[in-house]
Amino acid sequence: MLKIWGRDTSSNVQKALWAAEEIGLDYERVDIGGPFGGLDDPNFRALNPNGKVPVINHDGSILWESNAITRYLAGLDPSGKLWPTNAHQAALADQWMDWCNSHLWGPFPTVIIGLLRTPPEDRDDDAIASANETLEAEWAVLDAQLAKMPFVAGDNFSVGDIPAGVFAWRRYELPIQRNDLPHLDAWYARLKERPAFKKIVMTPLR
């Protein structure tokens, strides 16, 4: 049995939930973090000493860090549909997962917190605009990759698309300036056709 700790509005938790849905894995989810609190509870800290979500328990095996969890869940699928069989494509999937953490995650909280969780009169509009400008430059890097292939690692959807897809939903839903990135647009349209993406990621931002 798979148990996932984390609120369903968290981008990092959504990675794990999306992967589980893609492979049809049953799971139980526990609300924790954000408005639910509980991250400093000793029982939760025993699961993840960092006090962050998501955390999973799969048949007694505990794991934290969203990308590690997403990779792990993808590996549970006997069909292997989320992992490219080609070694280079598998490495590309890994590459773009890591790229999200190193290039998108840094400026994203400034935009999310500024627009969703800060009253208009208290917002630092210059900081939000600067962070979004940085993000748009990063999205252009992914757009260039998607000019060569329909998904980040090749012709088929893979685990490598999941982290970027979670961030992309926020890019397209937030009231921000977006540059013209046609290949990113086409990729995002393909993601929106996936039932698991619709169920897990396409939810109100808050």
Task: Please report, for each region that a protein language model flagged, where it lies by residue.
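GST-like fold's C-terminal all-alpha helical module
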Residues: 92, 100-193, 200
